[in-house]
């Protein structure tokens, strides 16, 4: 299943909009660099909402694993994810403020409490390669940058098209490739 992150994006968008408004007032009043009480309250409110969302998302994933007798949870990770990312003013405000590392650490903790094995899997090229066409899943290397070609393409946001024309959700394709890369279970039954 896919957990919808639109609520989290909305929280961040409202926080950034409100903070920009408060900052403009502060700048006009020449109050210096220290955050005002309203800015602190705005940040505290946003952090509480994000923390609540992450706790609920992690709990929902763990409850699903427990109710369906899933003993291993595989999570993709990327070491340089969001570091010095510059994807435009609007996208930076919505995307960079999402704490994926916080969700991963909460999942790791809850897995340990409930006896579920937690596996971190490197996820380079998992969203570009096609799961159904069994594309190669290379590991990204900064020292030796190669250009790879994949059989499928992402036709628009959230939709991935395989070589044979079949379409599937891009997040599902990426998740299946992360699972395939981890070699935790055999996926031959899916092909």
Which residues does each predicted region cover?
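Positively charged, helix-rich recognition surfaces that bind polyanionic ligands
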Residues: 1-191
């Amino acid at each position: 299943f896919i957990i919808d992150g639109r609520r989290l994006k909305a929280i961040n968008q409202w926080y950034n909009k409100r903070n920009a408004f408060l900052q403009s007032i502060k700048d006009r009043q020449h109050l210096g660099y220290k955050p005002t009480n309203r800015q602190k309250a705005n940040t505290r409110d946003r952090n509480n909402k994000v923390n609540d969302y992450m706790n609920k998302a992690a709990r929902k994933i763990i409850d699903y694993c427990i109710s369906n007798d899933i003993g291993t949870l595989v999570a993709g990770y990327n070491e340089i994810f969001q570091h010095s990312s510059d994807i435009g003013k609007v996208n930076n405000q919505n995307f960079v403020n999402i704490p994926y590392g916080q969700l991963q650490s909460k999942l790791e903790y809850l897995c340990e409490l409930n006896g579920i094995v937690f596996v971190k899997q490197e996820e380079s090229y998992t969203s570009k390669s096609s799961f159904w066409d069994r594309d190669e899943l290379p590991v990204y290397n900064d020292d030796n940058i190669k250009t790879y070609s994949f059989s499928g393409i992402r036709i628009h946001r959230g939709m991935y098209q395989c070589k044979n024309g079949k379409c599937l959700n891009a997040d599902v394709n990426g998740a299946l490739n992360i699972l395939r890369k981890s070699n935790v279970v055999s996926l031959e039954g899916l092909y």
